[in-house]
Amino acid sequence: MRQLPMTPPPGWRMELFEVIPHLLIGTRLASGTDYATLGVDVIVDLEDWEWAWVPTVPIGKVYLSFPMADEDEVDPKTRDVAHFIASLIGSGRTVLVHCTEGLNRSGVVAARALMVMGRTATDAISLVRHRRGLTMDGFPALGNEAFVEWLLSEEAGSDANRRAP
């Protein structure tokens, strides 16, 4: 696991990627980011508490922190956060989900939200990977295969539940 500094390095460029209309994933917010310029109603911050930087939140906008460690295992709250994001999008809100690099934690939460909204796991994974693209270092979104396997198992589990009498 890479250790990143508490604040972004000088010249840090925050990046946002539209996965579908009303759902964006992104990298760590740059210090001093003006929430109003992001074009979103809700920011869902998945960074560890020690890394989080909270922007000034204008009236009518929402900032939510669901800290998730940058580890190889899927955080237990991922499913609940994804359902919440899907409900926000369903109510017409535009949501930005971000972690440090906008790859794995943001990717698994966004993909699971897409599944809640009716996409297959394979489609959700492909869409997140395609829309996020590679980092400058060549890392893909959802490069953590444990996260991909979890998403596929979530679909298999929900399919089994639908078929149960």
Range-by-range predicted roles:
Residues 1-9:
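N-terminal glycine-/charge-rich "phosphate-binding" loop or analogous flexible N-terminal tail
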Residues 155:
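Histidine/acidic residue-rich metal-binding segments in metalloenzymes
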Residues 8-94, 115-150:
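Cysteine-based protein phosphatase catalytic domain of the PTP/DSP
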